[in-house]
Amino acid sequence: MGMAFTDVLITETDATVTIVDKHFAPGGHWNDAYPFVRLHQPSSFYGVNSRALGKNTKDTTGPNAGLYELASKTELVTYFNRVMNEQFLPSGRVCYLPNSEYIADGLIRDITSGVKTRVENQKTVDATYMNVTVPAVTAPSYEIEQGVQCIPPNELPNLTNAPDGYVVIGGGKTAIDACLWLLNNNVNQEKILWIRPRDQWILDRAYIQPGPEFADRILLRQVETFEIAAASTSLNQMFNQLVTQGILLQLDAAIQPTMFRCCTVTAQELDQLRQIRNVIHGHRVERIELDNLILNNSIQSTSPGTIYIDCTSNGLARRPVRPIFEGNHLTLQTVRTCQQVFSAAFIAHVDAAYENEDTKNELCTWHSYMEGQYYRMR
C-alpha cells in the first residue's frame, strides 16, 4: 500500500517521500510469500497507478485459461523493484530506506547496523496498519512437539521425499493455494487432510475481470447481487440466494461460511478443491504431536511421517476502526472492497486534492472484511 500511495502523491503533488521498509527490497510481504503464490485477481487490478502490472493478456492454459493473467511472486517482486528503481528514485523526490524500522517522531533505525537517523517530515503515513502477514515469518499459534515436520507453504517445493500424508491447517487463501499445489503435483487427495477452522465465501474469478468483453456480464452480476440483497428479509435468505445464483461459492454446501477475504477461484479450481474429502470443520489445532493432532475438542491420529503445512497466519488482520486522516498522521486502510492498493492510491489522491480533514475522512470511509455472518458491502 505504501508504494501505491507514494506513486499518486509524487504524481499529483511536489511532495518528497521517505519510505521506511523492514524488508531488504521493495515488494513488502511478497518478498516472504511462498514461491508458487499468484494473485487471486487479475494483474491489472494490482500495482501502482502510473505503471501497469502485467501485459494485459489472458492465460491460454491451466485453470485460469480464458481469463486475464495472475501475477506470480517473481513478477510482483520484479515489478515493485522496477517501480522503485526506474521511477521513484530517479525522480529525486523519494528516499528509500530498506532494512529499517520507524520508531516514532521521525526516528528511524537501520536494522542491520543499529544506526538511528531522524528525518524532518510534515506528515507520517502508516502503511503497516493492515498488518499483512505470511506463514514464513509468523510462528504458528499452536504447540509443536519436537520432531514434528510442520512447515510453511514456502518449503513445499523443497521436499525431497513423499511423506505418509499431508495436513493442511487453515481455511483461507494460503490454504487453498497449498491444496491446489499438492493436487497439481499429483498428490492423491486421500493423502490430504484439511483442517478448516472456518470456511470462507469465495467469488467466481470469471466475474472479476477487466476488459470490455466482460463488462456486460459483470454489470449484470452486480445488479443481480444488489437486487437479491434488497429483496431478502434475512441474512440466511440472502446468502442462500446468492449461492443459488452462483454469485457466492462455497467449498462445502453443508457448511455455512463465516468469513470473506476476497478469495477467488475458477470453476476448475473449485472442483479440484472439492476432491479433498478428508476435511475437519470448525476445529482449531492446539498441539501437534508425533502421533496425534490435538484439536480444541478432539484428537486425530496421525503418524511421525506426516507433514503439516501451516497456513494460519492472518493475511489481513482485523484491526480496530480508526480515522484515516488524523492531523498529520495518515493510516492506510481499505476503502474499496477487495482493493488494498487502489485504496492506498485513492487516499493519496484525496489527501492531495482536499484540504478539510472531515471531507477527507468522509470520502475515505474505512471498509472491513467479513467476520461472522455480517458483511458490509461497499
Regions inferred by a protein language model and the residue ranges of each:
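Rossmann-like dinucleotide/flavin-binding elements
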Residues: 1-13, 155-206, 342-378
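Glycine-rich active-site loop/strand segments that organize a redox cofactor
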Residues: 22-79, 195-252
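Glycine-enriched catalytic-core subsegment of oxygenase/oxidase enzymes
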Residues: 180, 279-378
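Long, internal scaffold/assembly segments composed of regular secondary structure
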Residues: 216-222, 226-310
